[in-house]
From Swiss-Prot:
Tissues expressing this chain: Expressed in both the central and peripheral nervous system, as well as in the pituitary gland.
Organism encoding this protein: Homo sapiens
GO MF annotation, one: ATP binding
Pfam families the record matches: P2X_receptor
Region (Disordered): 400-471
Transmembrane portions of the chain: 43-63, 338-358
Listed name of the protein: P2X purinoceptor 2
Subcellular location: Cell membrane
Membrane topology value: Multi-pass membrane protein
Protein task: ATP-gated nonselective transmembrane cation channel permeable to potassium, sodium and calcium. Activation by extracellular ATP induces a variety of cellular responses, such as excitatory postsynaptic responses in sensory neurons, neuromuscular junctions (NMJ) formation, hearing, perception of taste and peristalsis. In the inner ear, regulates sound transduction and auditory neurotransmission, outer hair cell electromotility, inner ear gap junctions, and K(+) recycling. Mediates synaptic transmission between neurons and from neurons to smooth muscle.
Membrane side Extracellular: residue ranges: 64-337
Gene3D superfamilies: atp-gated p2x4 ion channel (1.10.287.940), atp-gated p2x4 ion channel domain (2.60.490.10)
Amino acid sequence: MAAAQPKYPAGATARRLARGCWSALWDYETPKVIVVRNRRLGVLYRAVQLLILLYFVWYVFIVQKSYQESETGPESSIITKVKGITTSEHKVWDVEEYVKPPEGGSVFSIITRVEATHSQTQGTCPESIRVHNATCLSDADCVAGELDMLGNGLRTGRCVPYYQGPSKTCEVFGWCPVEDGASVSQFLGTMAPNFTILIKNSIHYPKFHFSKGNIADRTDGYLKRCTFHEASDLYCPIFKLGFIVEKAGESFTELAHKGGVIGVIINWDCDLDLPASECNPKYSFRRLDPKHVPASSGYNFRFAKYYKINGTTTRTLIKAYGIRIDVIVHGQAGKFSLIPTIINLATALTSVGVGSFLCDWILLTFMNKNKVYSHKKFDKVCTPSHPSGSWPVTLARVLGQAPPEPGHRSEDQHPSPPSGQEGQQGAECGPAFPPLRPCPISAPSEQMVDTPASEPAQASTPTDPKGLAQL
């Protein structure tokens, strides 16, 4: 029967573990070069290195331009101006009426359809049938003094006939008649596709002290006769409204009836290592509001025009549907800088070592002679002091370049340890200074290992416990 393993107290085990961790903290590791002559492993190693180099050269340096210092989000100013006239069923509309607000900022609306409720005055009238709990059968259904936040006025407590039809609604005091009862629709979209929009944009990158605008520096009246064309008139930022809607992939008639939000996106991506003439704006157009969501699609707003008739304040309430234009500017500028170049070069050179790590893992895990490779790859050198306290032990003796001291036998003169004791002796260092072995080859830091691909793994003989005879 096998002898029972000794059981250590829990405290002793913890102390041994702590001492082992403390001792391992002060170990020093130095790389050891082993040349393994294996074609498949060598091809894999060079292939991994090539892939890493291609990634850094093509993607990191050419595509991402990581050798440059960059700045995003330029300082920007936008001035807009709309021109054109249109007609509806009842009148002619000019810019002052259909553009809101008139200041010409980065966000503005062009009205394409209106629902107007004329001659509203303060008085009593039937509530809109669309308001919740507005319908009634008798005065008992209407509570006097009740105010509905989604309604049009203060309820008087009377149930009165609606504007048209047999229905009845509660009477309210407010601006009468209410919107749904007397509104008139007018469509302005007949000539709207021909409206012209001037978008003047200037950007500045403060880090690089670089500024530029999107209008050509010409004094011959160029802007009065040009319209935008990406190839021939890039610096003529005058767009037709129909062109913007078409580029956004929308139907102008549908958009004019329901309203919507169109984004004009100006992108300034500038490589400042090139001349300033190579830094040009790029325009794109897309719809910003979710048109397929009924609850939030479309765009409309209300405003009123006030006047007096015989001393009575009167107003015209207008519910306007239109196309809102949002001008959005973004960009990025880059210029060569030594610091990011050095950082990315160092990262590239360091990443090449991934190939060595991968091949080492394959070598020590899947190759036929993995135990022999492990022995060649990892050495443990213990350098305790002599009993007399002599220190230091020279590095040449540790690496095996110096001959052993007189009176010490070499490794070949020592008897082979019994089976099962070799691993214990290799893992621990005795209290006395052990004999240092000379390096078995000429170079202390590089070893040559031949690994024929077809050679099967062989078991080590008792006279060669480490399997070195296979090398």
